Amino acid sequence: MNFSVLNWNIEGSKYYTSTKLSKIIPHLEKSTADIFCLQEAQELREKILISNKLSNFNCVFPENKKDRNIILSKFPLINSGEISFPIIIHSVLEKAIWADIKINEQIVRIYNCHLEIVGVGPKQRLEQLNFIMEDAKKHLGPVIICGDMNTTIPVAGWGRKFIQLFHKVTNNNLITDQEYFHKDERHIFLKTAELSGFQDAINLHDSTWCIMPIRWEIFKLKLDWFLVRNIKKPEISLGKYVSDHRSILAKF
């Protein structure tokens, strides 16, 4: 079963790092990926319909046009849906979307996620990850969970204090487990995924986010993940910074 998936947070529209679609679309059209999982893609919906290449893909759009995750697939879509996370602090939350995709007579379940960031911390993101992995138990075949997981909390120190202040994260939302309290958030996130049988295809110490336009990888944060279960780990290629996130191409 040979196929490829491109995961990418394309826009960065929430903050000062907003990226113009005119820079993003050519990269998508040149990509050889069979499946795209895109975050912050709410402005892309109309562009897809008029793109010579992307308009030929099968699409999973959220029901609410303000929701920002999209899945595009060259392969047939068997089923799809949305996951609304339990309310944490907001009345409007990020959601995850999923699709069952038929690839060479096998059904692959793909989740495209964008986890919460403002006013929440590792505790809440782990709850959201567990919520997705619990849903994934319904599918016995290959499962992929990818997206911008916003694992933003660095090792204990001034950098962590800065991130907490910037994203309004209280100490109560941090991990209190002594083994992980002083570590970067990515370590407890990976352990939680592995306990449910998932492997991460991206190097744990890779940085996937920067401050644009200067491309400063402050704190060397790994926000983007590619978790797999019941399928071989893919080869990963990290793209250059066109948005504030690297694109991630996974070849199976």
Segments and roles (model prediction):
Residues 2-12, 81, 107-117, 146:
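Active-site-proximal beta-strand elements of phosphoester/diester hydrolases
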Residues 13-15, 42-47, 118-121, 150-156, ...:
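Active-site environment of divalent metal-dependent phosphoester hydrolases
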Residues 99-102, 109, 125-155:
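His/acidic metal-ligating clusters that form di-metal
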Residues 58-73, 88-93, 122, 153-160, ...:
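Active site of divalent-metal-dependent phosphoester/diester hydrolases
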Residues 1-52:
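N-terminal, active-site-proximal structural segment of metallo-dependent hydrolase catalytic domains
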Residues 36-40, 61, 144-148, 199-203:
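Active-site neighborhood of phospho(di)ester-bond hydrolases with catalytic His/Asp-centered motifs
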Residues 7-21, 83-91, 116-121:
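Acidic/histidine-rich helix-loop elements
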Residues 35-116, 238-239:
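Structured beta-strand-rich core segments of catalytic domains in phosphoester-bond hydrolases
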